[in-house]
Amino acid sequence: MSMVVYNNQECEEGNPFAGALTEFSQWLWSRPLGNPGAEDAEEEAIAAQEELEFPEDEAQARHSCLQRTTSWATPKEVSPSGRVYQTVRHSRMEYSRPTMSIRSQASYFSSSARPLPPPPVPSLMSWTPIAKYHPSSPTSTSSKLRRAAPKLIKRG
């Protein structure tokens, strides 16, 4: 069995990993799964999307998930179950309001001799309270800041 999980949190524009993750996700989703020549290959695809709005905060939350599983027959020497299962999934969540924007995305790939239970998909219901109620410190201007005099440290 092999498994790759790739996570990335984008908290500000210009994140150097954002392009790499998008590129990786596109490659992973477009990659042909399974044995293309197998006549008995079975494929299952799932697409889900959910949205929440918070009028009191002028905020929105979105979650989308795409998952594809392919299986095909294989000799018993390769797989005791007689089949190989490959799954690829891409999940993306966004939370935005006038003062902030949070984006998170993850890609997942697995290959196994037996069907694996699906990993838990993040839900907006469990994710948005973290973003919604996270306290932020008030911004201050330079006129309100008091600057301390630099201290010299002598080493001897």
Swiss-Prot record:
Q: Does the keyword section mention Membrane?
A: yes
Annotated segments matching region Homodimerization: 38-54
- GO biological process, alphabetically ordered: transport of virus in host, cell to cell
Q: Where do the record's region annotations for Disordered lie?
A: 55-80, 131-156
- Give all Phosphoserine modified positions: S71, S79, S137, S140
Q: Which domain of life is it from?
A: Viruses
Q: What does this protein do?
A: Together with movement protein P3a, facilitates long-distance movement of virions in host. Transports viral genome to neighboring plant cells directly through plasmosdesmata, without any budding. The movement protein allows efficient cell to cell propagation, by bypassing the host cell wall barrier. Binds ssRNA.
Quaternary data: Homodimer. Heterodimer with movement protein P3a.
Name of the protein this chain belongs to: Movement protein P17
Provenance organism: Potato leafroll virus (strain Potato/Scotland/strain 1/1984)
